C-alpha cells in the first residue's frame, strides 16, 4: 500500500512457468539459430542478470521447445540494443502466432495468427512483452531480434532479454524463476482481510 488510504494488493492464482530455464539463456534448453548470448547485463530494477541477444544472420532466433495446448501466454522482458524491435513467436503444428514490438515506445507492429498482445513498460527502457495464443499442438516459443516492423532480414544487431515465462492461461502472472525444471507458484492467500462489509461491489 502506498499510504493509509490508497494502494493495491496483488493476489494471484496458482501458476506454473513451463520454461525449463527462465533466465539462463546460455543453457541447452534454449536452442539458438544464428544467435549468441552474453551474460551479466543490467536488467530490470538494476539487476545484473540480463542478457545481450545478438544475431549473426537473417532470421536469427532463440527458442525453447515446450509441448502444450490450449491458451498459453509467453512473456519476456526486453530492451532495445543496437536494434529497436523484437518479434515474439508461438509455434504450433496447426496455427502459429507472432507479434513485432517497437522497443523505442512499446507499441506493437505487425502480428499474425490473431494473438492477444500486451506490452507493459518497466524501468530504464525495459518492456515486458506478452503474447497469448489459444491453439492446439504448441511446440516452441521464439524470440527474434528484429530490424524493423515485419523485418528480420538483417545479418547483425542485438537486443537485451530477461525473465522468460510460459504459462497456461490467457494472461501473464508475475515472474516465476525456473532452473532446469518447471516451477509452480501457489495461489496467494490473504488472511484477516475483512468481510463483505469491507470488500463488496461498491467499496473496498
Question: What is the meaning of each model-derived region?
Answer:
Residues 1-204:
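Extracellular and organelle-lumenal recognition/adhesion modules and their flexible linkers in secreted
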Amino acid at each position: 500500500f502506498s499510504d493509509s488510504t490508497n494502494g493495491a494488493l496483488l493476489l494471484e492464482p496458482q501458476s506454473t512457468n513451463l520454461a525449463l530455464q527462465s533466465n539462463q539463456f546460455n543453457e541447452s534448453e534454449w536452442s539458438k539459430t544464428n544467435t549468441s548470448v552474453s551474460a551479466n547485463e543490467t536488467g530490470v530494477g538494476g539487476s545484473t542478470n540480463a542478457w545481450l541477444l545478438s544475431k549473426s544472420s537473417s532470421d536469427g532466433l532463440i527458442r525453447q521447445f515446450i509441448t502444450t495446448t490450449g491458451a498459453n501466454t509467453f512473456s519476456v522482458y526486453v530492451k532495445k540494443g543496437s536494434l529497436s524491435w523484437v518479434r515474439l513467436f508461438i509455434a504450433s503444428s496447426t496455427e502459429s502466432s507472432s507479434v513485432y514490438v517497437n522497443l523505442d515506445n512499446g507499441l506493437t507492429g505487425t502480428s499474425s495468427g490473431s494473438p492477444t498482445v500486451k506490452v507493459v513498460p518497466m524501468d530504464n527502457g525495459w518492456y515486458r512483452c506478452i503474447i497469448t495464443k489459444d491453439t492446439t499442438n504448441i511446440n516452441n516459443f521464439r524470440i527474434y531480434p528484429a530490424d524493423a516492423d515485419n523485418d528480420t532480414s538483417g545479418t547483425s544487431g542485438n537486443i537485451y532479454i530477461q525473465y522468460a515465462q510460459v504459462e497456461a492461461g490467457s494472461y501473464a502472472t508475475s515472474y516465476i524463476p525456473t532452473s532446469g525444471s518447471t516451477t509452480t507458484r501457489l495461489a496467494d492467500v490473504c488472511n484477516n482481510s475483512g468481510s463483505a462489509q469491507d470488500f463488496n461491489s461498491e467499496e473496498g
